[in-house]
């Protein structure tokens, strides 16, 4: 049932996946949480951290949804790009990555799609994980491109970097990659050096999940309605957890279509 004012089921519909969130408590549409008035002398740091935590959660959810919606049921490559130099400058690393993306876009035989996530090693050095539809790429070329861009950058005392390629052709491995990215995004997003910056980039041509909401009578405990929403699709993952803001329970399902 559709309602103009309230909902207790949230759907994110995509080409390859469907995400379902079923709320124990009915939620009003369009209601915004009022910001607390906090002086500069008290509470500012805590408020900034809470805001950042929410933003980080949204970013991770967005990237996992994009990975699953664009790369499940497909063949793709998972490329890890590292610097030999202990590079910790986020802006500099992202400049090098942007040049590399422009280079490898040219060798793609189809419209190039990608998701790239930054990760920090224990010593603080940056490296990247690049998911793209460039399946079984020419390893020699993609390695030469990465090394040559780094060598030409006078700011870096480095003679190149390394490239590791894993070709993915089944959904089990795709979900393994998705879980790996989720785990390390959680770690990276907490870095102070990323404050006000993104730890990921994506191509504009990715298929996005489309949101919709509905109101279903007693949806949280209504197994028939839950099964109808799942609609015989494969359950990739499921969870039940407590909403940090309302204190009420949420059921979550990620489905492969």
Enumerate the language-model features and the residues they cover.
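Right-hand nucleic-acid polymerase module
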Residues: 1-124, 134-257
